[in-house]
Structures are given as C-alpha cells and as structure tokens.
Design a protein with these regions (language model features):
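Bacterial Sec-dependent N-terminal signal peptides
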Residues: 1-23
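Beta-propeller folds
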Residues: 19-224
Length: 224
C-alpha cells in the first residue's frame, strides 16, 4: 500500500513539474498610436493587431499557436482527458422546436457531429434535413452562423462562417424548393438579419477589404 502511495505521489510530482515549466512567451511588438478624446491622449500599443489581413498579424498568430501547443502537447494526461470528454459528449442532442410557416424546425446532433443539423417536419411526417452545415465544406471548417426566416417563412437567409472568421456570407433559399434566391452577400460582419415583411432584409456590412486594409465604415442595405 505504501509503495502504491509513493508511486502516486511520484506521478503527481512529475505531472506538476512538467506543467509548471517556464513558458517562453513570444514578445509582442508595441507600435504606439495616440488618439485624443476630449483633450485626453489615449495610447494604444497594439492597434496594429486589428489588421487581420496583414502578414505581421498572421505571423503573430502563428507564434502564439506555437507557444500554446508546445505547452498543451507536453501534458501527460491530455489524451485521456480528451477521451473522457468525448465519451461524456457522445449522446443525442435535440433543441426545442420552433414553428415557421407550416413546418416545425429543430436542431439535432447525433452525438459527436461537428455541427448540429437543422431538421423540419410537416404535421406528423418523418423529419427531413433542411440545412446540414457538416456538408458546407470537405474539411468541416465552414459553420452555420445564423438563420432568419421571412415573415411568411417562404424564404430563409442563413449566414456561414469560413474557418472561424468573423466575416460572414449570407445565402437566401426558397424554403419549399431549397433553391438559391438572388446573389450571395459577402463581407457581412457582426450583423443580424432583420426581414422587412417578405420584401427583403436589413443587414450591416463592411466595405470589401482592399489589400491589407480594412474599412471601419458600416453600410446599411436592404436586399430585394
């Protein structure tokens, strides 16, 4: 019994030592930008990181990931922890249903699917797949970011995010035929979709990025 206790103590010590090793953080460059608000100077050293298309920001993110995964990969119980979490998460999940037009919609995940699927059914018929985000891209990095139905539920506008980006694309389809309606809207960011009756909807978008420069101007549009 004492040997077992000593062995457990040794394992705990080794885990503690391995997880408390000094981390050599990548130093973030300071590029001061001064703004004046009501006579007060406000210094921002990291404004340059807001340019998410610049090579400098890309390099910064790369080095941050290097540091992070170097630490995570040396945790001895990481694989066991992942295995346990996957086991706990592997169960069917169904959201509360909601009514749009004649159909009842709900999201369902069979267990370990990357994204929940949007289903619908009519009366007591067998549910059918309406939107399956898992088929948006081969590598599974394109996600469903939002869904908004027109007032009569004849159309639905849904937004997608590629690679976890804040930028969105908005796609409109006919709910009965599932055929595309109009053009895909690009450069949507931090925006909800608000329908104006069944004529169209309002949304906010940024100007298309030019080179590595992003515009902070937000335009309001209505799509017909």
């Amino acid at each position: 019994m004492k040997k077992l206790i000593h062995a457990l103590q040794l394992i705990i010590i080794l885990i503690f030592v391995s997880c408390t090793q000094k981390i050599n953080y990548h130093q973030t460059i300071k590029k001061p930008v001064i703004d004046v608000y009501f006579g007060y100077e406000i210094k921002d050293n990291y404004r340059w990181l807001e340019d998410d298309l610049s090579s400098e920001t890309e390099e910064w993110v790369y080095k941050q990931n290097q540091t992070t995964f170097k630490y995570l990969n040396q945790i001895p119980f990481r694989k066991d922890l992942k295995k346990r979490l996957l086991k706990l998460l592997d169960y069917e999940k169904i959201t509360a249903p909601f009514k749009k037009g004649e159909y009842t919609y709900f999201y369902k995940n069979s267990g370990l699917q990357n994204q929940s699927i949007l289903y619908r059914n009519l009366d007591n018929q067998e549910p059918e797949i309406f939107i399956d985000p898992n088929k948006f891209s081969i590598d599974g990095t394109t996600s469903l970011a939002g869904v908004s139905f027109s007032k009569d539920a004849s159309l639905v506008a849904y937004s997608i995010s590629e690679g976890g980006a804040d930028w969105r694309k908005v796609i409109v389809i006919n709910t009965e035929t599932k055929e595309l309606v109009g053009d895909t809207i690009n450069n949507v960011k931090f925006s909800e979709i608000s329908w104006k009756s069944n004529e169209g909807f309002y949304y906010s978008s940024y100007e298309a990025p030019e080179g590595s420069k992003l515009s902070s101007k937000t335009d309001q549009h209505i799509l017909y």
